[in-house]
Amino acid sequence: MSLYRTFTADDAVEYARQYGGVSQPQTLVTAEEIGDGNLNLVFKIKDEAGISRVIVKQALPYVRCVGESWPLTLDRARIEAETLLTHARFCPQHTVTVLYHDPELAVMVQEDLSDHRIWRSELVRGADYPQAAAQLGEYLAQTLFHTSDFYQHPHEKKAAVSQFTNPELCEITEDLFFTDPYIDHERNQFDAALTPDVQTLRDDRALKLAVAGLKHRFLSKAEALLHGDIHSGSIFVAEGRLKVIDAEFGFYGPMGFDIGTAIGNLLLNYCGLPGLLAPREAAAGRERRLEDIRTLWQTFSARFLALSESDCREPALAESGYAALFLQQVWLDAIGFCGTELIRRTIGLAHVVDLDSIQETDARLACQRHVLSLGRTLVLAAPHIADVDALLARVRQSGA
């Protein structure tokens, strides 16, 4: 019989007292439910002074934004905790600390990050964290390299692929990224004024063939343990610091998916800034986003190549020059996946405030059309975008 029950605020406080690692657990007295995502309950556990000390996160057995009509496995809580613990082995400085997790209750206690801010919110208001892109590139390099065939023994890797099999959450990604936006589906959400633009995408056979190839790679390439949902809303930043959270979509998949999703969210902000800020501030912010993209990729690729020189355990993959060839394919994948992220965040189920918070209707529609056009371009032109300089040139040429 399952021990699972949905936590109340009082349950969360009591759980944090037991498992939060606080020196004086009796000082934990209140819980504030802060979850604004689609899948979980999230509580800030506060002491008598009102200071948040730890976070208690519990998976719900359904998609929160839809309700019980869309059930979900609770095993995703185990996968999230084990993904974060695995990533923390190789990049502790940029992975949220998991203090305790219980698969039966689908609950996890993790460090409080109240001194950090959600990166997406900071980007939307025009704030700059100049080290964040390099730190994210470091996180991606360390976690993807050390969970790949370059580092893991084949037996260990095959066991890990099984351990992190995540079919229900992967199905959500498969549908929301690669299927729903290109058909008439009830989950899609977009302004009626975009209907002609959406229909143009759905009628574009070349685009849909390219998206089919991306979906096939997502389904079949078990290259490394991905975060699986690495967007600017799952990243916390502070002065000189960055922490990645929310890894319930973790699974073994193509490295380019994590990288492309991260780049895609920087481009969503790039496209939205003209509708969010005054012209001069928007122009400056856009230049920073392009520099962030350059820094992210250059940091990732340089670190990955360095690790392949120093830590590769597979003799065949250690052959001089192979890692660089491999990264060329990762880059190609990343550009394509980036394009699908742009499209699905504009006309699919899960939108972003980088676009939706633009108050003026015409400005918002212009930014959304820019995103759709750029997303299509990246999906189709990925084989011809050889490096990050070529990507940034394409973005600059995309207008708006």
From Swiss-Prot:
Cross-referenced Pfam families: APH (PF01636)
Binding site for substrate: 229, 344
Superkingdom: Bacteria
Biological processes, Gene Ontology terms: L-methionine salvage from methylthioadenosine
Catalytic activity: 5-(methylsulfanyl)-D-ribose + ATP = 5-(methylsulfanyl)-alpha-D-ribose 1-phosphate + ADP + H(+)
Record's keyword terms, sorted: Amino-acid biosynthesis, ATP-binding, Kinase, Methionine biosynthesis, Nucleotide-binding, Transferase
Signal peptide bounds: none
SUPFAM superfamilies hit by this protein: Protein kinase-like (PK-like)
E.C. code: 2.7.1.100
Entry keyword annotation includes Amino-acid biosynthesis: yes
InterPro entries: Aminoglycoside_PTrfase, Kinase-like_dom_sf, Methylthioribose_kinase
GO molecular function: ATP binding; S-methyl-5-thioribose kinase activity
Residues annotated as binding ATP: 40, 57, 111-113, 246-248
Pathway listed: Amino-acid biosynthesis; L-methionine biosynthesis via salvage pathway; S-methyl-5-thio-alpha-D-ribose 1-phosphate from S-methyl-5'-thioadenosine (hydrolase route): step 2/2
Subunit comment: Homodimer.
Function noted in UniProt: Catalyzes the phosphorylation of methylthioribose into methylthioribose-1-phosphate.
Family statement drawn from the similarity comment of this UniProt entry: Belongs to the methylthioribose kinase family.
Protein name: Methylthioribose kinase
